[in-house]
């Protein structure tokens, strides 16, 4: 006889819903306390979506006599939403471990970049790599992220800069989206740097006249699926005018605006993003007060990256100011050759210690608000009936242990489940 349901998680000490009323994001006072059930159970259907959540005795009576493909006893454990990593660069070839010593000796990001390192070093090796090589390395990286509790991840291109390599990277991301268990939001980031031999204006023209029309064609044919458009809006890279042109053209072909802004210098990127209706802006270490207010008013998410500020010794993003002004704050790992971090629990820990976020704020930023930043908070980011069955089970009676613990999360996170399917078990 066929099973009636996919999964029963029973008798959890805590089930952290995050949201309980269908909120698409949490801001201001809503972040003070997250929705948590004590002594609860959860049911995921065969379609991969959550069917029921409630007190353990109520769920037991409601589903008495029903069959399940798998039952997990969660006594003494906590169930949380699968984590959402809102900003990564996971497709590339060419390790840059040698640059870490340069950073420790005091070299800045732009000094390394201008010396032929940084992005350009990775671009050369990514152009040389085969599609299969890039896929295998991406697969390994995404598996590391899944083991750390991530079930939805944003994946950027951006280490090609020419059309051929950018499309190669996007095909690799598309293959991962189709073949792997982790959820993926794909981002075209061809404006990650200005290619050698071109000016920023020439690079912007190439993207607008050649790259984006090709993306539109391939998307219409169903060959690749791209969700977002990104530009590195920065002094010495793409200025505000070039950024505006590229983002607007991307929006015109149906892409969500989700870009790098106000990282190393104040560029008024936040104000631009709010004006263009951006879904999210990342970094924001140098954002202005006016930009913060504009983002809050426009409901444009701020994706903060505490790993980057930590590794590059930048000043911390003003998370508290953003939270107090009502900005929708999300978190990302910024995984890339320059910030080699797979772990959203580590990101949350750094956000609490270095950016003075509370643990509820950090968890919301790594779940519902990160999902909002990717335009997916209607299906991801909280444990609610009708949402996708993406969740993690930790071997602790308090959910805060996920953030409190500094490292070693592969032992704390006992199960990772995506679309109701067990994808990792310690």
Curated annotation (Swiss-Prot):
Pfam families, per database record = Amidohydro_1
Record's GO cellular component terms: cytosol
The positions annotated for binding N-formimidoyl-L-glutamate are 159, 336
* BP-aspect Gene Ontology terms: L-histidine catabolic process; L-histidine catabolic process to glutamate and formamide; L-histidine catabolic process to glutamate and formate
Q: Note the SUPFAM superfamilies from the entry.
A: Composite domain of metallo-dependent hydrolases, Metallo-dependent hydrolases
Q: Which residues participate in 4-imidazolone-5-propanoate binding?
A: 159, 192, 263
Q: Which reaction does it catalyse?
A: 4-imidazolone-5-propanoate + H2O = N-formimidoyl-L-glutamate
Keyword annotations:
Histidine metabolism, Hydrolase, Iron, Metal-binding, Zinc
Matches recorded under InterPro entries: Amidohydro-rel, HutI, Metal-dep_hydrolase_composite, Metal_Hydrolase
User: Which cofactors does this protein require?
Assistant: Zn(2+); Fe(3+)
UniProt binding sites for Zn(2+)? 260, 334
Hydrolase found in the keyword field: yes
Q: Annotated pathway, please?
A: Amino-acid degradation; L-histidine degradation into L-glutamate; N-formimidoyl-L-glutamate from L-histidine: step 3/3
**EC number(s) on record?**
3.5.2.7
**In which domain of life is the source organism classified?**
Eukaryota
Protein residues bound to Fe(3+): 260, 334
Which family does the entry's similarity section mention?
A: Belongs to the metallo-dependent hydrolases superfamily. HutI family.
NCBIfam families reported in the protein's UniProt record? hutI (TIGR01224)
What name is this protein filed under?
Answer: Probable imidazolonepropionase
Cite the source lineage. Eukaryota, Metazoa, Chordata, Craniata, Vertebrata
Designated gene of the protein: AMDHD1
């Amino acid at each position: 006889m066929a099973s009636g349901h996919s999964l029963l998680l029973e008798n959890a000490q805590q089930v952290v819903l995050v949201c309980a009323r269908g909120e698409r994001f949490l801001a201001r006072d809503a972040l003070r306390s997250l929705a948590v059930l004590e002594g609860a159970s959860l049911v995921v259907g065969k379609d991969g979506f959550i069917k029921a959540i409630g007190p353990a005795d109520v769920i037991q009576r409601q589903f008495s006599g029903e069959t399940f493909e798998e039952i997990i006893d969660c006594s003494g454990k906590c169930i949380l939403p699968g984590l959402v990593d809102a900003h990564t660069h996971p497709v590339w070839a060419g390790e840059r471990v040698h640059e870490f010593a340069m950073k420790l000796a005091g070299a800045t990001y732009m000094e390394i970049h201008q010396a032929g390192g940084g992005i350009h070093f990775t671009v050369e090796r990514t152009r040389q790599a085969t599609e299969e090589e890039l896929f295998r390395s991406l697969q390994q990286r995404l598996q590391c992220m899944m083991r750390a509790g991530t079930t939805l991840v944003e994946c950027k291109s951006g280490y090609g800069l020419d059309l051929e390599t950018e499309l190669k990277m996007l095909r690799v991301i598309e293959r991962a989206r189709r073949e792997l268990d982790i959820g993926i939001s794909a981002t075209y980031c061809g404006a990650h740097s200005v290619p050698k031999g071109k000016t920023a204006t020439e690079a912007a023209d190439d993207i607008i006249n050649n790259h984006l029309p090709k993306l539109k064609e391939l998307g219409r044919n169903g060959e690749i699926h791209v969700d977002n458009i990104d530009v590195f809006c920065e002094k010495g890279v793409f200025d505000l005018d070039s950024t505006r042109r590229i983002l607007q053209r991307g929006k015109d072909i149906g892409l969500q605006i989700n870009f790098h802004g106000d990282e190393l210098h104040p560029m008024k990127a936040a104000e631009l993003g709010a004006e263009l209706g951006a879904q999210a802006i990342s970094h924001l270490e140098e954002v202005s007060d006016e930009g913060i207010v504009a983002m809050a008013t426009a409901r444009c998410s701020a994706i903060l990256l505490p790993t980057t500020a930590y590794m590059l010794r930048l000043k911390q993003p003003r998370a508290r100011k953003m939270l107090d002004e009502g900005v929708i704050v999300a978190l990302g790992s910024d995984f890339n050759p320059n910030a080699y971090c797979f772990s959203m629990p580590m990101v949350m820990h750094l956000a609490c210690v270095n950016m003075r976020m509370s643990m509820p704020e950090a968890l919301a930023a790594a779940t519902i608000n990160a999902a909002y930043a990717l335009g997916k908070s209607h299906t991801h980011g909280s444990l609610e009936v009708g949402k996708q069955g993406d969740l993690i089970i930790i071997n602790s009676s308090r959910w805060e242990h996920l953030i409190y613990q500094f490292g070693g999360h592969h032992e704390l996170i006992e199960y990772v489940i995506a679309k109701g399917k067990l994808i990792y078990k310690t």
